[in-house]
Amino acid sequence: NAMSSCNSPLHLLEGKVLHDSIIFSGCETDVMVGTTLVTMYSRCGSLHDASKVFDNIRNSNVVSWTAMIAAYARYGQDTEAFQYFDRMKQEAVIPNRVTFLCFLESCFRERSLEKGKQLHSSSIAMKLDSDVNLLTAFLNMYDRCGSLEHVKHIFVTSPNPDVVLWNALISGYADNGYGKEALLCLEKMEKEGISLSAVTILCGLTACGRINDEVKGQRLHSEVIMQGLEKDLPICNSLVDMYAKCGWLDTSQVVFDKISNRDVVSWNVLISGYVEQELAKEGISLFEEMKQEGISPDNVTFLCCLKACALLGSTENGQEMHSKIISMGLETQHLICNTLVDMYIKCGLLQVAEQVFDQLPSQDVVLWNVLITGYVEHGYGEEALQSFGMMQASMVSPTSITFVCTLKACSSMEALMQGREIHMAIVKKGLEKELLVGSTLVHMYATCADFEGAQALLVMLPSRTVISWNALIAGYAKHGHGD
């Protein structure tokens, strides 16, 4: 019908004209017509109009409530979506599987584990826990939220898991860094007579790359050929990535060269592979080839190339990348900024790094750590400690990395008083027994010739390793106590 063709903000005016004609005909309050109007306004991006129409519907049913919830979930306004969900239950309207599926998209986006758990409990209470599609959606939600325990629980309690549920479980393991477990599940799935799908192969290749298992990766590559998936772009990209992560760059390059429809992901995984193996020049060369093929870089491309520039110490390439980043409007993205600051520091351009840092509207702990680390590595201990003070004044909470870097700054300046102040801050955060933090504290006290304090700290460490002993010995040696 005419309303279904109004499906984007460009059609909002046309939709309002249709709405006026419906009001004139007196059908606006009809539940079916009203629900269609809600969906139309949602697709046109006008949640205010959708809400007004919904409030005028007589005897709203589960479909109209779900349409309203879906409207807010689609635009990431999950708080409002949950408010409608609560109102729906208060009015004794029972949600259906579609209601929950609409919600879960919002939980994916926000990675809202608590809200996802609430929805899961509600679906169980409403006897919807046997719906395979809904189970899979919940399993994927828990995977995205990093809750592997919930992923395993749903799978184990499913009577007859199909390939979709198996894929979700394998993906859950692979995405959360459990590559070995993911591959064990894949093998078990095969033993139970369930054929591998393209999604299974993708998850398996991700797992192989995570644990550098090129043998199982090659077996999956054979499966790709057997299933005729050699032209499937996501599969090809995953093969390039897997071989690169396993250090087989020649094979990765061969697979890449055979891809006829390469996209930005294809280039990114190969560039990343070379850079991770510290073949930075090859990574930059690939970036130039990518431009010649007319593929536009994205933030991942720049992250890889900035790392390559840092490895090379190439300010010329780095500044060229920076200019492109600005031209594409990516200069305010935190990960890009962190890498830019790191690149300029590693190239020895500390003033430029400071300028990039200062231009950001807000600085997170990672960015502060990058700056402080850069100062310490270049011997600017005083600037590192000043930055630490500014970081605290900005109410950014330091991490173990922050403390390790600032303690190194104190050691380089033999600034015992400042070291003791940092020690107090470490104790307040309960980090003094972490091996690296504790060992750096020992080193700071020993370097500043407070051997009594260094020895007392060494005794307090839960485990004394070669790192902590070396920290003390280095302090003694520095002050001529080599014996």
Regions found by a protein language model. Give the residues of each.
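Pentatricopeptide repeat
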Residues: 15, 30, 34-35, 50, ...
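Hydrophobic or amphipathic alpha-helical targeting/insertion segments
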Residues: 1, 6, 11, 75-102, ...
